[in-house]
Design a protein with these regions (language model features):
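Helix-turn-helix DNA-binding elements, focusing on the entry/boundary residues of the two helices
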Residues: 5, 16, 27, 42-45
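A short, Lys/Arg-rich alpha-helix, primarily the initiator
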Residues: 1-12, 22, 58-59
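Short acidic/histidine-centered micro-motifs embedded in hydrophobic/aromatic stretches
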Residues: 63
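Short, functionally important structural connectors and interaction interfaces within domains
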Residues: 6, 25, 52-53
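Short alpha-helical DNA-recognition segment
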Residues: 13-31
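DNA major-groove recognition helix of helix-turn-helix/homeodomain DNA-binding modules
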Residues: 43-59
Length: 63
């Protein structure tokens, strides 16, 4: 099953604002990543993986 960032966030029951805070970024930047208007930076992905260790990064960001 394909899981994207929105699906992942919804599965852990977080708002965009809560997710942005967890990964240490702004709501604006996070929202643009979800909408496909920005690509996640390496720094963003490192922070994401540190907070969500069990997340399948390939499935979320590269499928």
């Amino acid at each position: 099953m394909k899981v994207n960032l929105v699906d992942f966030r919804n599965s852990i029951k977080l708002t965009q604002k809560e997710m942005a805070e967890k990964v240490g970024t702004t709501l604006s930047y996070y929202s643009k990543i979800e909408l496909g208007l920005r690509n996640p930076s390496y720094n963003f992905m490192e922070k994401f993986k540190a907070k969500f260790v069990d997340a399948n990064m390939d499935e979320i960001f590269f499928s």
